[in-house]
Amino acid sequence: MRITATASLCLKSGMISVFITNLGKYNEGELVGEWLELPATSKEIEHCLMRIGIDGIHYEEYFLTDYESSIDGLSSYISEYSLLDELNELASRLAMLSPDEINLYQAAIEIGSSTSSIHDLIHLADNLDSFQQLAGVYNEYDLGYYWIEESGCYDLAQLGHLSHYFDYERYGRDVCLEQGGIFHSGGYVYHTGG
């Protein structure tokens, strides 16, 4: 099999990179493809397809033979059959997010609330407000302490010295299980609904 790659593997500033392969050439025993960094303009996509021989006349079909993302967990949703337009839409939405929102997005993917497709990931990028992040909360003790001491939900002053016997870690574990949240580099994240 002859291999022709017109660009090197390198995820630069894009959110998603895909190696697009000419299916017709592949079936003829030749691997002709190119890395494309997403998001990309329609012209960039068109030029990439032309460079690998997808001209709509001799060769019309392509598939994705490799892919990577700067977003943790995202690559597991991409397959060789993923739609390029859909991936580009996702990358465009992600490019508009701030670094803090990207961090929240990665945690939301890890939580896995109703994300089973690229379409779901696009929807998730548009609905990050349905997740709450508690910065500085990195373990069950911190979570229990936050909800008891800092959230204002409880008035421990009424308990007097009994409040010293409260098991923050155990309470935090229960809260985490109830909320289905996770601890990650930015703190604790949980789904609030929506």
List the predicted regions and their residue ranges:
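Short, glycine-biased loop/turn motifs at secondary-structure junctions and
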Residues: 21, 27-33, 52, 62, ...
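Conserved aromatic
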Residues: 39-42, 138, 165
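Structured domain cores in non-transmembrane regions
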Residues: 43-116
